[in-house]
Amino acid sequence: MGRLSWQVAAAAAVGLALTLEALPWVLRWLRSRRRRPRREALFFPSQVTCTEALLRAPGAELAELPEGCPCGLPHGESALSRLLRALLAARASLDLCLFAFSSPQLGRAVQLLHQRGVRVRVVTDCDYMALNGSQIGLLRKAGIQVRHDQDPGYMHHKFAIVDKRVLITGSLNWTTQAIQNNRENVLITEDDEYVRLFLEEFERIWEQFNPTKYTFFPPKKSHGSCAPPVSRAGGRLLSWHRTCGTSSESQT
């Protein structure tokens, strides 16, 4: 009986030693199997590529680019196509907080998400949504909720939150000029803390810009020395008319 007990104890000791030796390997394997939070950096200007497959095909965010596309544009990946994929991955909600929004491709992506039943909310700057080519009017016409500021300063944020878990932010204005010509950056991250902070900021602004709180004659914005009254957008010269909140354009 004593000999049997000794053998059992020895076997248990060997088993424990092997388990302890294998434990670090098991933990490393489990950690490697765990999905890592997304961290992606995009840099602009973006190469001009065809984005029709992303914006037209069912399940667009997963669609492959068509081999027989009649357009003469390249059909590879670009910073813009990667940004579109990140947006089109939305399944429940998309919150946009954007200073300027005139990119037709990004505008179509937002409308496509709305058509799929994704809840889309947009916060923007009241003056820059009056630019010729702005997508804001089209989004409103499609039934998407849009709120704007009435502050003397600009609503200068440039971020999006996808499904309350993915943050897209950076220097990029959502305009063709910025996408194709400017040195810009966009960070895409699933960092929980950053997503939480930006979501809190969005909700705060969304409530602050509630239309029931609007005043009929808000104070006019002052350009100051760093914001000239003339700007370029899409190759056109835009001259601001602050008294009516519109702009005129001349070809350059």
From Swiss-Prot:
One of its GO terms (biological process) is meiotic cell cycle. MYC stimulates its phospholipase activity. MIGA1 and MIGA2 increase PLD6 self-association affinity and affects the homodimer conformation facilitating its phospholipase activity over the nuclease activity. Single stranded DNA (ssDNA) hydrolase activity does not depend upon, but is stimulated by the presence of Ca(2+) and Mn(2+). Its main location: mitochondrion. A zinc finger (C3H1-type) spans 45-78. GO terms for cellular component: Golgi apparatus; mitochondrial outer membrane; mitochondrion. Predominantly expressed in testis and ovary, but not limited to gonads (at protein level). It is also found in brain, heart, pituitary gland, prostate, pancreas, thyroid, bone marrow, lung and muscle. SUPFAM superfamilies: Phospholipase D/nuclease (SSF56024). It catalyses: a cardiolipin + H2O = a 1,2-diacyl-sn-glycero-3-phospho-(1'-sn-glycerol) + a 1,2-diacyl-sn-glycero-3-phosphate + H(+). Residues 1-39 are annotated as: Required for mitochondrial localization. InterPro entries: PLD-like_dom, PLD_domain, PLipase_D/transphosphatidylase. The chain crosses the membrane at residues 5-27. It is an enzyme of class 3 (hydrolase). Keywords: Differentiation, Endonuclease, Golgi apparatus, Hydrolase, Lipid degradation, Lipid metabolism, Meiosis, Membrane, Metal-binding, Mitochondrion, Mitochondrion outer membrane, Nuclease, Spermatogenesis, Transmembrane, Transmembrane helix, Zinc, Zinc-finger. It is found in: Mitochondrion outer membrane; Golgi apparatus. It is a single-pass membrane protein. GO terms for molecular function: cardiolipin hydrolase activity; protein homodimerization activity; RNA endonuclease activity, producing 5'-phosphomonoesters; zinc ion binding. It holds the Pfam family PLDc_2. Its EC number is 3.1.4.-. Residues 1-4 are mitochondrial intermembrane. In contrast to other members of the phospholipase D family, contains only one PLD phosphodiesterase domain, suggesting that it has a single half-catalytic and requires homodimerization to form a complete active site. Homodimer. Interacts with MOV10L1. Interacts with MIGA1 and MIGA2; possibly facilitating homodimer formation. Interacts with GK2. Presents phospholipase and nuclease activities, depending on the different physiological conditions. Interaction with Mitoguardin (MIGA1 or MIGA2) affects the dimer conformation, facilitating the lipase activity over the nuclease activity. Plays a key role in mitochondrial fusion and fission via its phospholipase activity. In its phospholipase role, it uses the mitochondrial lipid cardiolipin as substrate to generate phosphatidate (PA or 1,2-diacyl-sn-glycero-3-phosphate), a second messenger signaling lipid. Belongs to the phospholipase D family. MitoPLD/Zucchini subfamily. This is Mitochondrial cardiolipin hydrolase. It comes from Homo sapiens.
